[in-house]
């Protein structure tokens, strides 16, 4: 991506999402030791156009605080990196993972931290999850949410509005609503894009603008997400 790079930091997740577009990714080939990241780190060092690194997976927060801290230290030593973005579902499904050590690691880094969580329904944002998200926000971390539009789960104005409000109430910005990626075994979750467009139009009538996520789709070969207008 222009100005950005993505690194698969871990091959495991705390939960198996049936609609995940990386469900068949060869995670067994991913680095298991810190030195195994060195080729990727060297590539980052040599490309001064990259100012933001995305840690993805799997789930980066499946790494221990110690291992994640070692990786962040190496990233901090790359002078042209300015921001660290972590894509994770852990604060939603395993909120105790948001430890004091993790918060200190993120907020004391010279890299500006951004955490993108993944919640699809307000029923996921329960008390423990709310507390974990508030801890991140109050520590000064920018926290965004991305959701997937799923038939029978959140394909109604009420469900999407409730999700946005539950996130906004704890300081998390609804960022993206993804059209389902067509992965094997997930066809029953797919919502017609015209339905998605109507849902977004209704959300705009009901919610303040900042609480309405962008409706987007991943298209193979494109260098960015495509907004569904």
Predicted features, each with a name:
Residues 1-21:
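N-terminal pre-triad scaffold of radical SAM enzymes
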Residues 7, 53-55:
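Hydrophobic positions in the central parallel beta-sheet of the AAA+
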Residues 11-13, 59, 90, 121, ...:
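Short, flexible loop/turn elements at secondary-structure junctions
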Residues 20-32:
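Iron-sulfur (Fe-S) cluster-binding segments and ferredoxin-like electron-carrier domains
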Residues 27-29, 57-58, 86:
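Surface-exposed cleft-lining segments at the edges of enzyme active sites
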Residues 38-52, 61-207:
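Conserved AdoMet/S-adenosylmethionine-binding subsite of the radical SAM
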Residues 197-229:
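C-terminal accessory regions of radical SAM enzymes
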């Amino acid at each position: 991506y222009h100005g950005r790079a993505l690194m698969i930091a871990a091959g495991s997740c705390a939960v198996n999402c049936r609609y995940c577009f990386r469900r068949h990714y060869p995670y067994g080939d991913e680095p298991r030791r810190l030195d195994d990241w060195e080729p990727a780190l060297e590539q980052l060092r040599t490309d001064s156009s990259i100012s933001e690194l995305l840690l993805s997976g799997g789930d980066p927060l499946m790494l221990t605080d110690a291992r994640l801290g070692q990786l962040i230290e190496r990233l901090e030593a790359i002078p042209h990196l300015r921001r660290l973005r972590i894509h994770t579902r852990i604060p939603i499904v395993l909120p105790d993972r948001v430890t004091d050590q993790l918060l200190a690691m993120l907020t004391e880094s010279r890299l500006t931290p951004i955490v993108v969580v993944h919640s699809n329904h307000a029923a996921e944002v329960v008390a423990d999850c709310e507390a974990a998200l508030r801890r991140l926000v109050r520590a000064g971390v920018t926290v965004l949410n991305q959701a997937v539009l799923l038939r029978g789960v959140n394909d109604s104005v009420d469900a999407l509005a409730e999700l946005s409000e539950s996130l906004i109430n704890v300081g998390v910005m609804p960022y993206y609503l993804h059209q389902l990626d067509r992965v094997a075994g997930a066809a029953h979750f797919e919502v017609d894009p015209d339905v998605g467009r109507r849902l977004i139009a209704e959300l705009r009538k009901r919610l303040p603008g900042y609480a309405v996520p962008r409706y987007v789709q991943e298209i193979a070969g494109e260098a960015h997400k495509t907004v569904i207008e």
